[in-house]
A protein has these predicted regions:
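N-terminal redox-cofactor-binding region of secreted/periplasmic oxidoreductases
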Residues: 3-409
Length: 409
């Protein structure tokens, strides 16, 4: 039986509902005092914003920043998890992801996959960030890109206008716009055998990328061994060909050796914008629709709660409701709001707003696994703990080999 919480299509991470097609319309702008992230659901209850963004994660905070930039639009963001400020080191210290991880804590949705036939029926953990910054706050800091073939496949799937917005060339421009590449330290570059092409990277974006301030012998040894035995080294893994062995960039700021993610790069610098309100600790339960015109259903707001037993709140959208709740929660909210397979919705007693069978189906994620081995000299490996030294604690193991799994079978 298909479950209401079934996996989402990978391309449905961000869904946008247009409320007004009148370009001259100017929505109401709330003149708040200095904006602060709040956990009080009453602070936005009953109010109207031009844009209501559901999910303060990797994509949601980027949109909040850009939509509120010129001051003419009011923006509300609703994040299910906490702000994370009270546990800041868990997010900003890179090696914390190895020794003090936010995975399997309150900052993680702690999802598990369904039983996997080719893993002897096992269910596997699938971490998803439940905090401001989303998965960009709790991941392993790997900064990698898809291959040209994958990006171009998205354009094909998007239909006749897909090449106007998707495809490798368009996506590369966007990826470079968001990136600020910082060169590796000479000692690290030599020891880890780091190779890259600067022309494939951005230099002025909010997200800082670089390599850790320290590295260790096994990293360079892995690059040499894997490239000779199995997967050849790739010299420009960010230019459209990522199949190969290389040391991946980390989303890290070389100035302070801290994680660079959507919260501290897109939200924190704009904390004084009075047209932006961020609510944490509240789940959106349903999108509200105006169905007066059966041929043009419009989203006009959302309902949200602090928990199942708490009071339900409502916030209204003048222009758009934007779902940025991730690959699982975005389609879940759509289904709970009546958008999805009519057969599934009817079985669960949900009023069908739009019969759209693809919602919540066909998600496939990449497979990854690590290699473990003993070393003869334990002085040539990371210290296995957070040390308090910023350079030492910047270490994350980012030596990778990407292969086309279809070629293995």
């Amino acid at each position: 039986m298909t479950r209401l919480f079934s996996w989402a299509a990978a391309l449905s991470v961000v869904s946008v509902f247009s409320v007004s097609q009148v370009s001259a319309y100017v929505g109401e702008v709330h003149n708040y005092t200095r904006r602060a992230t709040t956990g009080n659901g009453w602070d936005i209850d009953g109010k109207s914003f031009d844009y209501v963004i559901v999910g303060g994660g990797t994509a949601g905070l980027v949109l909040a920043n850009r939509l509120s930039a010129d001051g003419s639009n009011s923006v509300a963001v609703i994040e299910a998890g906490p702000s994370g400020y009270e546990d800041n080191d868990k997010f900003i210290v890179p090696s914390a992801m190895l020794y003090d991880s936010a995975v399997n804590t309150q900052y993680d949705w702690q999802y598990k996959t369904t039983s996997q036939k080719h893993l002897n029926g096992k269910e596997k953990s699938w971490p998803r960030g439940k905090v401001l910054g989303g998965s960009s706050a709790i991941n392993g800091l790997y900064y990698v890109r898809p291959s040209r073939e994958e990006a171009d496949a998205w354009a094909e799937l998007a239909g006749k206008n897909g090449w106007n917005h998707w495809g490798w060339d368009n996506l590369l421009n966007g990826m470079k716009k968001s990136e600020k590449l910082q060169t590796p330290l000479k000692s690290v570059r030599e020891q880890a055998h780091i190779e890259y092409d600067g022309s494939s990277h951005g230099r002025n974006g909010p997200i800082h990328t670089t390599w850790p301030a320290v590295t260790y012998g096994p990293v360079g040894a892995f690059i040499e061994s894997a490239s000779k035995v199995a997967v050849p080294r790739v010299k420009d893994a960010y230019g459209g060909e990522n199949h190969g062995t290389y040391v991946a960039l980390s989303s890290m700021n070389k100035r302070n050796w801290q994680r660079s993610f959507s919260r501290n790069e897109y939200l924190d610098p704009i904390s004084d914008r009075n047209n932006l309100q961020v609510l944490t600790g509240h789940l959106v339960t349903q999108v509200i629709f105006d169905r007066s015109d059966k041929n043009h259903v419009q989203a006009t707001g959302v309902h949200y709660k602090a928990s199942v037993d708490e009071v339900e709140h409502t916030v209204h959208a003048n222009k758009e409701v934007i779902l940025c709740a991730g690959a699982i929660n975005t389609p879940q909210i759509l289904q709970l709001s009546g958008i999805g397979s009519s057969d599934l919705l009817n079985r669960h007693g949900i009023d069908v707003v739009v019969d759209l069978p693809g919602v919540g189906e066909n998600l496939q994620d990449h497979i990854s696994f690590g290699l473990s081995f003993r070393v003869k000299n334990d002085k040539d490996v990371a210290p296995q703990q957070i040390t308090g030294n910023k350079k030492t604690d910047s270490y994350v193991n980012s030596a990778v080999s990407y292969v086309n799994f279809e070629s293995l079978f």
